[in-house]
Amino acid sequence: MSRFLRIRAGTAGAVVLLGFLLAERASAQQRIDAPRVDGHTTPLLVYSAENGPAGCAPLAVISHGAGGSENGYRYLAEAMARMGYTTIVMGHRESGLEALRADMRQYGLMAGVRALVADPTAEADRLLDVGAALRWDASQCKPPFRVLLGHSMGAETVMLEAGAKNIIGVTAPPAGQNRFDAYVALSPEGPGVVFPDDAWGGIHKPMLILTGTRDQSLKGGPEARQIPWHDLPGSKGQCQWMGVIDGATHMNFAGNGVGKERVEPIVTTTIKDFLNSWDNGACALPQPTRGISLQGK
């Protein structure tokens, strides 16, 4: 066989292999329209658990930020699936891209973002989406452990589910149902827009808060995103952690922006350490790692 033909054959084989791998990845995801209790539906993108033990896998549910969709946060969803979790990324239609664009047209850029994240109806609908995701997963099997993760407006959803007080009129229920075993809040908002001072003092379950030194907030700058952790009361075994990533911006946590390649592995490794530590019953902080400062209580 000539060198040219060997190259052509090798290239063809690589293309076939790539197509097979892409097909495998595609087959590991499932799109669902899950019914909500109000008669509407929420789109779910389900990532199958990998490398886990036999039986029903633990469940990770991911809530995107304002203007996002179930197609985002792929780096986080794939990492959770590799950890052995059935992973559901919810699509919050009432606070997705169309809703954000409408608010921006009416109020301007930042005022539009603020209007959407402080919309009580949009937040209540997000919590109905959470219920839809939980019911769909429960129809498949009963997971031994459930964790809710969210970024930005999704971190607000995490806090409202866990029982944080709010000043925008989201009632309990749908807020405060506390249906998960642990929570992960990426770039949570401090007091002033959705939450009052001392909003988080009643949350006792394991919680990981992650933010960055360049993670700007709607009110108060990057430091405001650390306030929720300081208000948490602490939990048995010191399972309430906060990590501050050096140089991380708000959009890095969504898998976007300059520096995301450095930030993403720090995020996913810290989440893995947190969940593994809780599972071991000790919640001991890992050894200090370059690029992030961690605290626990």
Region spans (language model):
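Primarily recognizes the serine-hydrolase "nucleophile elbow" in alpha/beta-hydrolase
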Residues: A133-G202
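The feature captures the conserved acid-bearing segment of alpha/beta-hydrolase catalytic domains
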Residues: T171-V244
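Alpha/beta-hydrolase-fold serine-hydrolase catalytic core, especially in secreted/extracellular enzymes
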Residues: G247-T249, A254-K297
